[in-house]
From Swiss-Prot:
Belongs to the ATPase alpha/beta chains family. This is A-type ATP synthase subunit B. The gene is atpB. Component of the A-type ATP synthase that produces ATP from ADP in the presence of a proton gradient across the membrane. The B chain is a regulatory subunit. The lineage of its organism: Archaea, Methanobacteriati, Methanobacteriota, Methanomada group, Methanococci. CDD domains: ATP-synt_V_A-type_beta_C, ATP-synt_V_A-type_beta_N, V_A-ATPase_B. GO terms for molecular function: ATP binding; proton-transporting ATP synthase activity, rotational mechanism. It comes from Methanococcus maripaludis (strain C6 / ATCC BAA-1332). It comes from the Archaea.
Length: 462
């Protein structure tokens, strides 16, 4: 679009439906372009082009289409895509889903204005995810180790404490090493006012806000803003990582609300629906978010992602968790059964997996015994869980002494490793020491996954 076209105001709005309006007789308009809208009473609004074909453009209005009409509404196409002004001063601030200050502070003086869609990374320019990120949560650090540049989702369900877990991770997460700079970018999408107050209060009262940038999109905010929020958050994270050399952890919650907004917009555009009514391009759209995690050659900083999503009806085969699993590098699954037992955080380590855990474990990263002792504990816990089903049928009296030790181990594992306080920040050394303590429950001859050298070095003497 040339400079002359940017000054043209169109009054050829032919149709308004829900949050969308259709403008006829336009030319040179591109998909994703930002639109300035003037209402009949002179109020200014903003929109974005969702579809451009021939001489027609379909525009989603961020603030909604109330008070707009087809005869007096004026539209100007800016020729620019959605951008956000970024600055190091964003740390310690809270913004709405569109990047406007929500904490009563001043507007940010931008050091740069960046396209919120990011820029495609050549796969050759990527470094593999590496180095340990400590969350202070034993079931993540120990069994599902998070590494810099990784993307690993948390699969939760309605009513499970994923919000509490998200704020605990944001508060406790850190990278180990002298002089390493670390920050958290937290983006909440489609949340209630109560949840918003909870997040803001937690960040403020715990001091976590000092090293964080927070974006809040409420359930009654426009659906198109919900689409922008994670992109704005990731653009901020990329700036802090690749321009300021920081290691950035991005926590996105709730991706289910994001996908519902995608479905809402697709329905308003009368698109042909895919699985369960979601648009056919949802996989591509999610990939555009998740693939912005990583490490770039020649850049000091990294972007690590923990997207959180609630599985409708606890169905892990639902399109949202299903497609997410194809793109990301594992998953952390919250269990309703563990939650009913009063266990927090209710992380079920058996279906959980970090495909890149090995990149962050071992001497110089965590500890030399990490992978072996966790493998031993995982196998013992899995056997103990299986024995619970057997006990339900034949009773505990029918078990051998060996079986009873594994059953006891499974209970102790849940009560001392999985369970931890909401304010309990465990180092990886503490987690591994707790695991070794539990292994004393098992007969020595059952410790087949750890070497004699490691047993001599770490196993407490009875």
């Amino acid at each position: 679009m040339d400079a002359m076209q940017k000054t043209i105001e169109y009054t050829s709005v032919s149709r308004i439906a829900g949050p969308l309006m259709v403008i006829d007789g336009i030319e040179g308009v591109a998909y994703g372009e930002i639109v300035d809208i003037t209402t009949p009473n002179g109020e200014k609004r903003t929109g974005q082009v969702l579809e451009a074909r021939e001489e027609i453009a379909v525009v989603q209005v961020f603030e909604g289409t109330s008070e707009l009409n087809t005869s007096e509404t004026k539209v100007r196409f800016t020729g620019d895509t959605a951008k956000i002004g970024v600055s190091y001063d964003m740390l310690g601030r809270i913004f709405n889903g569109a990047g406007k200050p929500l904490d009563g502070g001043p507007e940010i003086i931008a050091e740069k204005k960046l396209d919120i869609n990011g820029y495609p990374l050549n796969p050759v320019s990527r470094n593999p995810p590496n180095a340990f990120v400590q969350t202070g949560i034993s079931t993540i650090d120990g069994t599902n180790t998070l590494v810099r540049g990784q993307k690993i989702p948390i699969f939760s369900g309605s009513g499970l404490p994923h919000n509490k877990l998200a704020t605990q991770i944001a508060r406790q997460a850190k990278v180990r090493g002298e002089g390493e700079q670390f920050a958290v970018v937290f983006a909440a999408m489609g949340i209630t006012g109560e949840e918003s107050n909870y997040f803001m209060d937690e960040f403020k009262k715990t001091g976590a806000l000092e090293k964080a940038v927070v974006f809040i999109n409420l359930a009654d905010d426009p659906a198109i803003e919900r689409i922008l929020t994670p992109r704005i958050a990731l653009t901020t994270a990329e700036y802090l990582a690749y321009e300021k050399g920081m290691h950035v952890l991005v926590i996105l919650t709730d991706l289910t609300n994001y996908c519902e907004a995608l479905r809402e917009i697709a329905a308003a555009r009368n698109e042909v629906p895919g699985r369960r009514g979601y648009p056919g391009y949802m996989y591509t759209d999610l990939a555009c978010l998740y693939e912005r995690a990583g490490r770039v050659k020649g850049r000091e900083g990294t972007v690590t992602q923990i997207p959180i999503l609630t599985m409708p009806d606890d169905d892990i085969t639902h399109p949202i968790p299903d497609l997410t699993g194809y793109i990301t590098e594992g998953q952390i699954v919250l269990s309703r059964e563990l939650n009913r037992k009063g266990i927090y955080p209710p992380v079920d380590i058996l279906p959980s997996l970090s495909r890149l855990a090995g990149n962050g474990q071992g001497e110089g990263k965590t500890r030399d015994d990490h992978s072996k002792v966790i493998s031993q504990a995982y196998a013992a816990y899995a056997e103990g869980r299986g024995l619970r089903d057997l006990v339900a049928v034949v009773g505990e009296e029918a078990l051998t002494e060996r079986d009873r030790s594994f059953l006891k181990f499974a209970d102790a594992f849940e009560n001392s490793i999985v369970t931890q306080g909401v304010d309990e920040d465990r180092s990886i050394e503490e987690t591994l020491d707790y695991v070794w303590d539990l292994l004393t429950i098992l007969p020595r001859e059952e410790l087949k996954r750890v070497s004699d050298e490691l047993i001599e070095k770490y196993l407490p003497k009875k």
